[in-house]
Amino acid sequence: MEQYEKVEKIGEGTYGVVYKARDRATNETIALKKIRLEQEDEGVPSTAIREISLLKEMQHRNIVRLQDVVHSEKRLYLVFEYLDLDLKKFMDSSPEFAKDQRQIKMFLYQILCGIAYCHSHRVLHRDLKPQNLLIDRSSNAVKLADFGLARAFGIPVRTFTHEVVTLWYRAPEILLGSRHYSTPVDVWSVGCIFAEMINQRPLFPGDSEIDELFKIFRITGTPNEETWPGVTSLPDFKSAFPKWPAKDLATQVPNLEPAGLDLLSSTCRLDPTRRITARGALEHEYFKDIKFVP
């Protein structure tokens, strides 16, 4: 750890404390994540080390680069490129952002580029939210943070500071207890983030797992075997769930153009097998006026 000098604590993420730090060798500013392990006395699980090592291979302009992994005295430090702005802070400080449909489209496109890259390497995020979409102020590039960490460390119910980990972006198959979910969970999260950029408020702001599910079902309609084959077999599905009819998504996101609404509805399909893929979303007509392909 001698190589890195902590400058200041900048936040407390899902997995531990995040510091702004300096690489003594290059003088570069970096972000240092100290991973808090549940079984501290047992040291770092080898599975976590393996997973994290794979993430060093992931290099893409829309992913926050993992530069180094430092494993010392039962502690694990992850060294990332330093970015001090995230999408949540950006939205909170820019009330005009919702009116800039072009900017929203560019952000969404970049988020999907990063996700498509990760999915092509069989890496899931599982906990996408505006707080872990970082923005490079100099280029307006959006970069995804914390990709792959859920598989290495699991997603705790609470952060180590006892904040509840948000459920607002969590896919219905996870909320219903599915153990066999895959890449569509990230696409669901992106749909929620897309709607939030347009509306300037979260689409499904549930305060518990059941409240989250019901907020979703009130808009999408309560699923059944016809609309989502296999749903009644999921561990946490209850036949006593209220049976809400589906609403037109246009009533929930009134300021979105028709092509955007079509894309949004294809990310927010309850049945994960019918949800659009990240790669498919990039080819959607909503993006037809975007010239560059990162």
UniProtKB/Swiss-Prot annotation:
Tissue: Found in most organs including root, young leaf, stem, vegetative meristem and flower bud.
Phosphotyrosine carried by residues: 15
Entry's EC annotation: 2.7.11.22
Record-linked SMART domains: S_TKc (SM00220)
Gene Ontology biological process terms from the UniProt entry: cell division; G1/S transition of mitotic cell cycle; regulation of G2/M transition of mitotic cell cycle; regulation of gene expression; regulation of meiotic cell cycle; signal transduction
InterPro entries for this protein: CDK (IPR050108), Kinase-like_dom_sf (IPR011009), Prot_kinase_dom (IPR000719), Protein_kinase_ATP_BS (IPR017441), Ser/Thr_kinase_AS (IPR008271)
Residues where Phosphothreonine is found: 14, 161
Family assignment from sequence similarity: Belongs to the protein kinase superfamily. CMGC Ser/Thr protein kinase family. CDC2/CDKX subfamily.
Protein name per Swiss-Prot or TrEMBL: Cell division control protein 2 homolog 2
Originating organism: Medicago sativa
Upper classification of the organism: Eukaryota, Viridiplantae, Streptophyta, Embryophyta, Tracheophyta
Gene designation: CDC2B
